[in-house]
């Protein structure tokens, strides 16, 4: 797909404590590579990827492919950048929330990140996929899978154990998030309403500031 040759531009935000592997996961997804020498993200960065999304119809048939331009925003996990990070929450349509399977505190902080999303995202029930990263470091693991899955079930969000080093479940996690977003858009009664994190190929968003309160209750929020 050439520049501008897409149906939707969709913004994802990767969140989580510093050092959980957000940059490495996004790099693995967009480039299929792992770089163990990434330095800590300062502020905000992003990567891009073009994909084709095909949804199954009610009869099981695969529908027309939607051409998606994904912007994957990479945020700093340090507390001193928190105000900058939260400023980007409303502009994103979906959230990839990561913790480090070898760092219990990063898992305990997942609740705080979700609380921040509920306060600052485009609606109180945004689409989130939870990822326990660094699954390849099994001998260093301190967070049990059943504990992480239990937390995800409490919030009603999908959970994957990922590895930026070998690519395990990285694409699946992001594809699941995209599927959630596209289905949310399909549920919109008024198809002219699309959250601010989605831009049509003509460059227009459909958010109307005069109807912001009405929009907060739209599309399954």
UniProtKB/Swiss-Prot annotation:
Residues 211-221 have a biased composition (Basic and acidic residues). GO terms for biological process: antigen processing and presentation; blood coagulation; complement-dependent cytotoxicity; cytotoxic T cell degranulation; exocytosis; exosomal secretion; melanocyte differentiation; melanosome transport. The modification Cysteine methyl ester is found at residue 221. It comes from the Eukaryota. Signal peptide: none annotated. It catalyses: GTP + H2O = GDP + phosphate + H(+). Keywords: Acetylation, Disulfide bond, Endosome, Exocytosis, GTP-binding, Hydrolase, Lipoprotein, Lysosome, Membrane, Methylation, Nucleotide-binding, Phosphoprotein, Prenylation. The modification N-acetylserine is found at residue 2. GTP binds at residues 16-24, 74-78, 133-136, 163-165. The modification Phosphoserine is found at residue 2. Its main location: membrane. It is a lipid-anchor. InterPro entries: P-loop_NTPase (IPR027417), Rab27a/b (IPR041837), Small_GTP-bd (IPR005225), Small_GTPase (IPR001806), Small_GTPase_Rab (IPR050305). It is found in: Membrane; Melanosome; Late endosome; Lysosome. A lipid is attached at residues 219, 221 (S-geranylgeranyl cysteine). Residues 202-221 are annotated as: Disordered. Small GTPase which cycles between active GTP-bound and inactive GDP-bound states. In its active state, binds to a variety of effector proteins to regulate homeostasis of late endocytic pathway, including endosomal positioning, maturation and secretion. Plays a role in cytotoxic granule exocytosis in lymphocytes. Required for both granule maturation and granule docking and priming at the immunologic synapse. NCBIfam families: small_GTP. PANTHER family: LD44762P (PTHR47980). Belongs to the small GTPase superfamily. Rab family. This is Ras-related protein Rab-27A. The gene is RAB27A.
